């Protein structure tokens, strides 16, 4: 089945207000910028995003934040986005902070049909005990806090129960993809993309290099086409650098 659509706008056209999105990438590496830009242009709002971080100001998911399109986010590292911090502290954005490895496993588990799993990460902290601020009110008071989670002991070690994540849509960026949706990621751009691709009920992939079925060595496929519903060819995407260090 040919899953290629002509434009990013066409690919995201049915993402409605209030949808949940799993978005791949780490920092500015491997993020689906064309799909995010198309979402901004579509006017969709009240979104819930699941992503390692929310980009930086005006880039990646930071673009959706800039236009105030995100209602809630499940994230791990968010310290590089000033607008994110402003919206969170002003009570405009709900934030569920999750340990990075736990977030990756929650996405992977959701995609594999695993409803929940136990992990030692977060035991003895507000991650497990509850009380972590999720939303502030306009005056700076805490309006919503995280609930306490179930804990259980195995072989003398305490673990906390974490739930798998499934989202309405997933947006991912791949280096190479074929018309059947088989994807290959390149180097660090693989971060969170495979997990997000499996977690979405409808997964949309933007690919730098579009090839015909059979051209990708099956042994190098990172996300099989069974997980992917739409493919958009986005050649020569901008390669933004989050932090540049040069020798004096």
UniProtKB/Swiss-Prot annotation:
Residues at which CoA binds: 24-30
Classification via PROSITE patterns: COA_TRANSF_1 (PS01273)
Keywords in alphabetical order: Transferase
Annotated GO MF terms: succinyl-CoA:3-oxo-acid CoA-transferase activity
Annotated transmembrane regions: none
EC assignment: 2.8.3.5
Pfam families: CoA_trans
Catalytic activity: a 3-oxo acid + succinyl-CoA = a 3-oxoacyl-CoA + succinate
Protein family according to the UniProt entry: Belongs to the 3-oxoacid CoA-transferase subunit A family.
Subunit text: Heterodimer of a subunit A and a subunit B.
Name of the molecule in the record: Probable succinyl-CoA:3-ketoacid coenzyme A transferase subunit A
